[in-house]
């Protein structure tokens, strides 16, 4: 399909005169368009669930979440990868965002980078891609050559490939094991896919990465138990997590967190099972670090 025929490139009838609207009407119109995003993403629930299940299997075997994209799509992948480190306490090398043109492209567009399939292959080769890895290819238009090249190389290696696009029957979808296509319709500003398409991609990435982390045992009930308390805000959050899941006082939560060397999950197990540090460590080791499995026995 030619670029001009893509849904993401069509003019939106609802915003034809946005340039002459009052500020409040402008805001309301964009907001109304944004409300369509969650509905579009909802049509892909089954595919997103499939992506989570398959990705979780690979991740548990040591695989990595690797995001590839150009422009806004690439930046969203980098953002999702970066946030997983402090949120779930994973090592930075377990979630990696690749953007066409390299790190500099996060801030300034690198002309022509997205048009190279070979560039993506080289970027993935540099990471020593393997069959346990998960490659998520993002392209609002569903046709970015950089993403296609990366997905093809990943498939050849045997890695799991997931495509995320905002058009139906996307080109990248034909190069992936699982194709997620949230059709959000024309943008409020024609072709500005950082808007609805970007929001849809972010929502989908939120669900996939969160789902994978939940299945690794990094969430107990609905709290983050592998959060790394590296500043005062996160230390306070860690203590509140311990309090709300165990019912202890603030001082006891803080004291136990210190005894557990700032490991929230370990502190919870110590308190819930009335164990000392080593006993709690052994309980967690027996359940591969899964707090819920320890406490549900």
Swiss-Prot record:
One of its GO terms (molecular function) is ether hydrolase activity. PROSITE patterns: GCKR, SIS. SUPFAM superfamilies: SIS domain. The active site is at residues 83, 114. One of its GO terms (biological process) is peptidoglycan turnover. It is an enzyme of class 4 (lyase). Pathway: Amino-sugar metabolism; N-acetylmuramate degradation. Residues 55-218 form the SIS domain. Its EC number is 4.2.1.126. Signal peptide: none annotated. It catalyses: N-acetyl-D-muramate 6-phosphate + H2O = N-acetyl-D-glucosamine 6-phosphate + (R)-lactate. Keywords: Carbohydrate metabolism, Lyase. A lyase-type mechanism (elimination/hydration) is suggested for the cleavage of the lactyl ether bond of MurNAc 6-phosphate, with the formation of an alpha,beta-unsaturated aldehyde intermediate with (E)-stereochemistry, followed by the syn addition of water to give product. HAMAP family: MurQ (MF_00068). Belongs to the GCKR-like family. MurNAc-6-P etherase subfamily. Homodimer. Specifically catalyzes the cleavage of the D-lactyl ether substituent of MurNAc 6-phosphate, producing GlcNAc 6-phosphate and D-lactate. This is N-acetylmuramic acid 6-phosphate etherase. It comes from Lactobacillus gasseri (strain ATCC 33323 / DSM 20243 / BCRC 14619 / CIP 102991 / JCM 1131 / KCTC 3163 / NCIMB 11718 / NCTC 13722 / AM63).
């Amino acid at each position: 399909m030619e670029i001009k025929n893509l849904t993401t490139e069509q003019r939106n009838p609802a915003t034809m005169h946005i340039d002459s609207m009052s500020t409040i009407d402008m805001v309301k119109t964009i907001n109304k368009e944004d409300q369509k995003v969650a509905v579009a993403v909802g049509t892909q629930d089954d595919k997103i669930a499939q992506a989570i299940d398959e990705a979780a299997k690979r991740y548990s075997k040591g695989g990595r979440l690797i995001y590839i994209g150009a422009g806004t799509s690439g930046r969203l992948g980098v953002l999702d990868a970066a946030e997983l480190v402090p949120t779930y306490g994973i090592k930075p090398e377990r979630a990696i965002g690749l953007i066409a043109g390299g790190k500099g492209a996060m801030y300034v567009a690198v002309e022509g980078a997205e048009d190279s399939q070979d560039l993506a292959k080289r970027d993935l080769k540099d990471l020593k891609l393997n069959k346990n890895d998960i490659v998520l290819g993002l392209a609002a238009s569903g046709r970015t050559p950089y993403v296609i090249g990366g997905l093809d190389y990943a498939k050849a290696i045997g890695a799991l490939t997931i495509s995320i696009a905002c058009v139906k029957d996307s080109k990248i979808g034909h190069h992936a094991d699982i194709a997620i296509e949230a059709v959000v319709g024309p943008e409020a500003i024609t072709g500005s896919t950082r808007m609805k398409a970007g929001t849809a991609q972010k929502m989908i990435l939120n669900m996939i990465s969160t789902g994978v982390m939940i299945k690794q045992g990094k969430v107990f009930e609905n709290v983050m138990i592998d959060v790394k308390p590296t500043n005062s805000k996160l230390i306070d959050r860690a203590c509140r997590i311990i309090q709300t899941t165990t019912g202890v006082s603030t001082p006891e939560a803080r004291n136990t967190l210190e005894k557990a060397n700032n490991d929230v999950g370990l502190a919870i197990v110590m308190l819930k099972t009335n164990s000392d540090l080593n006993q709690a460590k052994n309980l967690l080791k027996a359940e591969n670090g899964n707090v819920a499995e320890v406490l549900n026995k």
